[in-house]
């Protein structure tokens, strides 16, 4: 279907080559004086935009009674720049379409003619590829006459290729005008790369200062006439800008060392990269030589490429290739030779057998070992308490044997709470001490605790009872809060500190139940104890479960006991401690936790009231 659509459009637009009526095309006559000394380049323009402007200007000058002529080209500027070229000999043969793979090159509306036929007249027609059927006059016909150049021996002939020196003054001459003695300074029309240069009307073009952008393809036109007709003489000159000669010897950029480590039996590529300063009349030379004892020979080049080229210098690389490095190559010398008109430079390189990379493996192994040590150290630092508890689990040592003490720990807490806290049923220090501590430390791990409100019969002397209980305990656990430090129970902490200074087996553990500020009335020893004694922080719901970090730290400070009855429970809960702490809202609460209609509501209430109290 797509092919049929193209065929239909081709017939509608009248794109058939045969029968193309070019009588309405704008006509130009050009003369090309061809020189037989070398291959010249000739250019034809297809400026349909200029034709459109000329017709529009002519139509604007008509009187109001005259009807304006139809615009010859109604397409956009982009459409008018995409043109198709045709050629026709003078004999009247049919038009021939110039394809893209023909000897004539097409670029941006220009046609480059490379192979002229002397003493011949050809017609070249161009028109847009995309046009409406009524644009029959949207075309340009150029009648080109090719003649050999006369007066070949005339002096000061302008070349079709001219060179300008950067940073200096210069001029561009029209080649066709230099040997035309019968033409006296005609008015010129100059083009550069297909664009009109309206500021230049004379020959030559004088330049006060030459820059890189001055190079390009220049076209010069001037008009000649006789009594019968007139025609345009055209010539093309290619202008190239160059810099001043750099009078320095070539510099070898690579190789930069005198030796190269290689592997025997492997292929090898040896590049020689050289920087040459610009020299107009000198050709750079790069060669590779091989020297062996008294013999020397040149090696064939595997590859040559130009790496960089500017108006000041150029970098060229020549490469040789060895299919296999042999033991004999280790005794040879490979010489890179570079030369210009100023002098030459050489670089000699020798091949050396590459040693085994034992050092690399040693370094890699050491680095891996160091990384392993650092990872192990970080693991031990983060899970040190868990590792210690694991060792205690399998260690047949019980430090409670023979110490003549009755309790593993004495728990001190505040049993006073404000009416506001009681109203919401918050998790108080008393609930933590009387419910959670027995469930975890006694029921799960087999420790024996002493709770004043549970295990001491009232009626004795309070101070004497406290001192007696602390002396019978291996540890002292103190739940700190604002009500504790500002209440009468702070005496128990003071008494324990005094006893710990005498009894080295008594160790004290502080639990920061919530944030508090030290009262000024605290004794000096108590203030100092708050700074030096180990402290474990209670974190609300995160600390409730027996596998939480809170209970792991408490067990770390508790005495070591060997109880086979509780070993399985301790190991199971201990392994949970290596995994990240989970959100305990989804876990089943301990039996000592207050129950409500649903477990989520009870635990959220505990977290909320705990934060409100502290």
From Swiss-Prot:
Residues 378-614 are cytoplasmic. Residues 1-19 form the signal peptide. Residues 20-356 are extracellular. Glycans are attached at residues 21, 151, 227, 344. Pfam families: ig (PF00047), Ig_6 (PF18452), TIR (PF01582). It is found in: Cell membrane. Residues 59-78 are annotated as: Disordered. Residues 405-558 form the TIR domain. InterPro entries: Ig-like_dom, Ig-like_dom_sf, Ig-like_fold, Ig_sub, IL-1_rcpt_fam, IL-1_rcpt_I/II-typ, IL-1RAcP-like_ig, Immunoglobulin_dom. The chain crosses the membrane at residues 357-377. The keyword Protein transport does not apply. GO terms for cellular component: interleukin-18 receptor complex. The active site is at 492. It is a single-pass type I membrane protein. The keyword Signal applies. Keywords: Cell membrane, Disulfide bond, Glycoprotein, Hydrolase, Immunoglobulin domain, Inflammatory response, Membrane, NAD, Receptor, Repeat, Signal, Transmembrane, Transmembrane helix. It is an enzyme of class 3 (hydrolase). Belongs to the interleukin-1 receptor family. The TIR domain mediates NAD(+) hydrolase (NADase) activity. Self-association of TIR domains is required for NADase activity. Forms a ternary complex with IL18 and IL18R1. Within this complex, IL18R1 is involved in ligand-binding and IL18RAP in signaling leading to NF-kappa-B and JNK activation. This is Interleukin-18 receptor accessory protein. It comes from Mus musculus (Mouse). The gene is Il18rap.
